[in-house]
Amino acid sequence: DVCDSLVGGHCIHNGCWCDQDAPHGNCCDTGGCVWWWCPGTKWD
């Protein structure tokens, strides 16, 4: 699934969160979370 919800500057969906200002860019793409760009998950 695609990360499509912005919460507090982070994109959160399906257990992942993505920092739009991360060094490698936004880890969310049309295919979902690009896990190797994500700094962590909301479960951490």
UniProtKB/Swiss-Prot annotation:
Where in the sequence is 4-hydroxyproline found?
P23, P39
Disulphides:
C3-C16, C11-C28, C18-C33, C27-C38
Transmembrane feature ranges: none
Where's it found, cell-wise?
A: Secreted
6'-bromotryptophan found at: W17, W36, W37, W43
One GO MF annotation is:
ion channel regulator activity
Organism superkingdom: Eukaryota
- Keyword line: Bromination, Disulfide bond, Hydroxylation, Ion channel impairing toxin, Neurotoxin, Secreted, Toxin
GO cellular component entries: extracellular region
Tissue note: Expressed by the venom duct.
This chain's function reads: Mu-conotoxins block voltage-gated sodium channels. This toxin reversibly blocks voltage-gated sodium channel in cephalopods, with no alteration in the voltage dependence of sodium conductance or on the kinetics of inactivation.
Know anything about its domains from the record? Answer: The cysteine framework is XII (C-C-C-C-CC-C-C).
Protein name in the entry = Mu-conotoxin-like Cal 12.1.1e
Organism whose genome encodes this protein:
Californiconus californicus
